[in-house]
Curated annotation (Swiss-Prot):
GO terms for cellular component: cytoplasm. InterPro entries: PCRF, Pep_chain_release_fac_I, Pep_chain_release_fac_I_sf, Prokaryotic/Mito_RF, RF-1. It is found in: Cytoplasm. SMART domains: PCRF. Peptide chain release factor 1 directs the termination of translation in response to the peptide chain termination codons UAG and UAA. It comes from the Bacteria. Belongs to the prokaryotic/mitochondrial release factor family. Keywords: Cytoplasm, Methylation, Protein biosynthesis. The gene is prfA. One of its GO terms (molecular function) is translation release factor activity, codon specific. Residues 289-308 are annotated as: Disordered. The modification N5-methylglutamine is found at Q237. SUPFAM superfamilies: Release factor. It comes from Vibrio cholerae serotype O1 (strain ATCC 39315 / El Tor Inaba N16961). This is Peptide chain release factor 1.
Amino acid sequence: MKASILSKLESLVERYEEVQHLLGDPTVIGDQNKFRALSKEYSQLEEITQCFQAYQQAKEDLVAAEEMAQEDDAEMREMAQDEIKAAKAAIERLTDELQILLLPKDPNDDRNCFLEIRAGAGGDEAGIFAGDLFRMYSRFAEKKGWRIEVMSSSEAEHGGYKEMIAKVNGDGAYGTLKFESGGHRVQRVPATEAQGRIHTSACTVAVMPEIPEAEIPEIKASDLKIDTFRSSGAGGQHVNTTDSAIRITHLPTGIVVECQDERSQHKNKAKAMSVLAARIAQAEESKRAAEISDTRRNLLGSGDRSDRIRTYNYPQGRVSDHRINLTVYRLTEVMEGDMQSLIDPVIHEHQADQLAALADQN
């Protein structure tokens, strides 16, 4: 391992011990904001500290085993060779783990996120598939102990949704789901298909981090066009007799957000503004990323329908991720929310790309 990396790790361990000491300080315990911030830092440093300590122990084990290999006793020398092999394997594994733990963290990864699903090409079947995707993500969220909150929805005529915007509340929601952005294609025989022909339809998914209230940039009132209208669809008689639905247009960017799920116009406006802030921030981030993009691939989808990331093939029971050439024959389980086998390989590939980029810089 490079001396610069070892030095960085040693300084992180020092900081971990310092934070550990501070958390026992009565003045810190009495300051809830400071205590909360230090507790978060402590938990972030704990994993890398434990990993580095295990790495140091493996190095010590290797030295001890190499010394044992010099013994006169043949049985001891044979035992030492096994220990040398085990220590070297541990050092290699822990080195890889430490490099990943040292990768720059996306500050948004720990945040809640907005999940937008839109029916694309494929008519009624695309709307039904949008409903299937929302159910899949909802089941996955349940397994993670997260909470799904519908922000806005537009139901399709024959089931499912034309559009669904939901907020996913939970630690690490954005970091886990951010690679879901892009085009999702389904191949299956629709229930209404008498000839048994396979149809292809598509949906687009966009995942955006929630912007905390304190960090929302000021949006000028003059930049907004706010329309109220009567809610359509589910919600009961009361909803349909008042202009409770809200449509907000951000004039400088042309971004439009509608919200009609709440009975209260005030609540609909608050929800729409939070989605609008996330969309504006995402548009700015996409622009920044495009300006500094290089020849490296970007596994983070754009949410554009042309950016196809995954195919769900029902006749073959398979799901394929086109970004990393991954195919799993577990379609039923995936649609029931068992998505980790699809999510983890993309995250690992992204980390490998980050490591390659760092290697090029050094």
